[in-house]
């Protein structure tokens, strides 16, 4: 096959490309340039798409003897990821820009151009697996074998079309073995640290970034009884479950810590309460993505709401036509925010199967 290797400049994508070459595919490496501002992400080594990362990706491709290109997706990245991030916080949501980037840029946009240029698939360094069912139908997306690095959650926002054109060569390997393989191949990125920062906020100050783009939208912090505690500069400064930075002078009557339990962007009201007030038992989600035929109607499954969070079993009611689902949790979750992805899994001894996902729009205690 003719495959496009998405080269982030890290060790995982390097080994993924190497394995694709070893498998006999015709491989071309591509690094995505995502920043319109050369003073931010392009010069930072903390993100996943800096100038240093591009140079690392080129060196790997040179080592493998495959062509290497840099594609400028900065306009689409700004529109689909950065602007969406800002808009979501402005309405009281807590988005995950890395999931959004996977959905809109690293797969949808990359595949769109790749297929137009005659490529059959995109190969990435994500820790997830695709397995073919016995009847030879469409492949299933499963968790990677390394529980500490599994990235099936961040891929749960993809559509079936993207999954059909993906290859995840490192999903059946644990991270230490990937580093050993990279070292044996002579890749300079063998010991390169993983990146976790939001690439377009290289200094890590999310509040300052949002404040610059959203501006002052004053509102009030209140307790569970509606008592006003202090004014704030905007709901974008808060997320569900937040404890630090509330700057409330008067302590709670019972002396317990306060957490953000609700955000009403329309009124600018931020409600705080105890950890107990964070517990929710029902999740409503829309903007559904379907990766498995079992994601329909009434099903028992598991749900994960954070990239590195645990799973909770639930009873799901899924209406494909209405683009909506309700998840009744078998045990409560804490700190679940609107805008997060709820990814559904079907437990399986060979690796949990990703059924699909939805974007959380409402929760109930």
Swiss-Prot record:
HAMAP family: tRNA_thiouridyl_MnmA (MF_00144). It is found in: Cytoplasm. It comes from the Bacteria. Transmembrane segments: none annotated. It is an enzyme of class 2 (transferase). Keywords: ATP-binding, Cytoplasm, Disulfide bond, Nucleotide-binding, RNA-binding, Transferase, tRNA processing, tRNA-binding. PANTHER family: MITOCHONDRIAL TRNA-SPECIFIC 2-THIOURIDYLASE 1, TRNA 5-METHYLAMINOMETHYL-2-THIOURIDYLATE -METHYLTRANSFERASE. One of its GO terms (molecular function) is tRNA binding. It catalyses: S-sulfanyl-L-cysteinyl-[protein] + uridine(34) in tRNA + AH2 + ATP = 2-thiouridine(34) in tRNA + L-cysteinyl-[protein] + A + AMP + diphosphate + H(+). The active site is at 101 (nucleophile), 199 (cysteine persulfide intermediate). Its EC number is 2.8.1.13. Disulfide bonds join 101-199. One of its GO terms (biological process) is tRNA wobble position uridine thiolation. One of its GO terms (cellular component) is cytoplasm. Catalyzes the 2-thiolation of uridine at the wobble position (U34) of tRNA, leading to the formation of s(2)U34. ATP binds at residues 6-13, 32, 125. Belongs to the MnmA/TRMU family. Its main location: cytoplasm. This is tRNA-specific 2-thiouridylase MnmA. The record marks 126, 340 as: Interaction with tRNA.
